[in-house]
């Protein structure tokens, strides 16, 4: 595990059923081992079999060392995924550009430990390389995320029991995302889109940089980007520079204080809830609906109702045609009073992989009413093989060496191998790493 603190996050996205410590302890009872790679002795470190300190930002180098050893020892074995992989032959030459001795030096992890961990991981009956926030918000984070999955693939642990597996949610939302990559780029620094979205990190530059396409208005739903994003002061300046900012949020906080208008929705206990996001990260297949606990006051609207009305207003403002205005108004009335969030959830459940459809005699199939009748949720089975059917690539294969990551390796090498890291340290006014190794 790299850069994850289960004791604090309770496992975050892998916490189905909570009690992460119990799950980690059960791994040991089965003869397994839990290894944590983290530059800080976190609250979770004391529960690990091993904790290795690592130089901040050097996670990619550590993973390259592991992969290099696995290939050198002849331990690379993709298992049943072998016929569903492209780019296998590229990986070994790519990692062999780096010297293992230098990797040990820049990561702070002994060469003998790197070799041992690589051999133990590749030789285990099942294993998984997993990382979270700590490796996602640092320099070379993209490379680190890629290399972790390379580790899982080359050791035969991708989509295998005991390895990296994927749930089958009761409402399949992934097919709706129309996943895409680099079909267009951002205006200022040319960042590629992913699934129709840009990273939040570029919002400030898109607001502050003049020119055609400059962001001048913002509609925000929840979140507190001044605190949650890096360089909050720059975000404050950007928000203050907007011509108009609408916040849909129940709170006046560090971000919404810049809004021209705040539209507060009803509270979370005043509306029903079905989780669409976290079911994508479950460690079992299950489904649960939480009904509202309190009646919504007539003056309060849900987020869905607020956005439904806003969309209707936008649509009518964008046309001068009276017939179109009338049509948009009729659609709005239909959606507002007929297509409620509960009905959307019910349709998703009924026509999902476990759904009852419109068959009234299908007693086993899922529907919203069935979830309401089982308030603690319904177990839908353990995780099962989902690849290659679950792949969204055109050829139904995993591209093990995407060009965007391959092209970024020279930057990694320049930083850690060709003296870039030492140059940065000598030019910096700071001579300390703000990382504590103190025991909690």
Language-model segments: residues:
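Cofactor-pocket helix-loop regions in the catalytic cores of large enzyme subunits
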Residues: 1-160, 165, 169, 189-387, ...
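Glycine-rich, small/polar surface segments that engage phosphate groups of diverse ligands
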Residues: 173-174
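Surface-exposed loop and adjacent secondary-structure segments within mature catalytic domains
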Residues: 178-183
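Long, compositionally biased stretches
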Residues: 371-440
């Amino acid at each position: 595990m790299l850069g994850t603190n289960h004791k604090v996050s309770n496992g975050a996205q892998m916490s189905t059923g909570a009690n992460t410590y119990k799950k980690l302890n059960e791994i040991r009872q089965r003869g397994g081992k839990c290894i944590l790679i983290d530059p800080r002795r976190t609250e979770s470190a004391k529960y690990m079999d091993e904790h290795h300190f690592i130089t901040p930002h050097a996670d990619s180098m550590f993973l390259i060392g592991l992969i290099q050893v696995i290939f050198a020892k002849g331990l690379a074995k993709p298992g049943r995924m072998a016929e569903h992989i492209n780019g296998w032959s590229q990986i070994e030459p790519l990692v062999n550009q780096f010297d293992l001795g230098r990797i040990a030096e820049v990561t702070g992890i002994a060469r003998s430990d790197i070799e041992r961990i690589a051999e133990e991981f590749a030789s285990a009956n099942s294993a998984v390389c997993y990382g979270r926030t700590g490796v996602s918000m640092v320099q070379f984070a993209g490379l680190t995320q890629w290399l972790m999955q390379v580790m899982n693939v080359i050791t035969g642990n991708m989509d295998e029991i005991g390895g990296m597996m994927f749930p089958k949610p009761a409402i399949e939302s992934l097919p709706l995302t129309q996943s895409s990559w680099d079909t267009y780029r951002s205006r200022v620094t040319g960042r590629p889109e992913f699934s129709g979205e840009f990273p939040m990190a570029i919002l400030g530059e898109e607001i502050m940089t003049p020119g055609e396409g400059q962001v001048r208005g913002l509609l925000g739903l929840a979140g507190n980007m001044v605190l949650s994003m890096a360089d909050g002061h720059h975000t404050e300046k950007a928000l203050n520079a907007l011509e108009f900012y609408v916040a849909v949020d129940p709170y006046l906080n560090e971000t919404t204080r810049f809004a021209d208008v705040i539209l507060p929705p009803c509270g979370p206990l005043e509306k029903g809830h079905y989780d669409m996001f976290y079911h994508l990260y479950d460690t079992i297949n299950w489904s649960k609906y939480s009904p509202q606990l309190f009646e919504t006051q007539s003056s309060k609207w849900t987020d869905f109702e607020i956005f439904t009305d806003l969309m209707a207003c936008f649509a009518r403002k964008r046309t001068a045609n009276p017939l179109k205005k009338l049509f948009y108004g009729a659609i709005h009335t239909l959606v507002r009073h007929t297509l409620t969030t509960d009905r959307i959830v019910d349709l998703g459940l009924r026509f999902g992989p476990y759904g009852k459809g419109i068959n009234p005699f299908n007693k086993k199939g899922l529907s919203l009413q069935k979830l309401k009748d089982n308030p603690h949720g319904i177990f839908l089975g353990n995780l099962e093989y989902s690849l290659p059917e679950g792949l969204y690539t055109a050829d139904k294969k995993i591209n093990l060496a995407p060009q965007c990551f391959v092209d970024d390796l020279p930057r990694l090498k320049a930083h850690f191998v060709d003296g870039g890291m030492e140059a940065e340290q000598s030019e910096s006014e700071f001579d300390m790493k703000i990382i504590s190794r103190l025991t909690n």
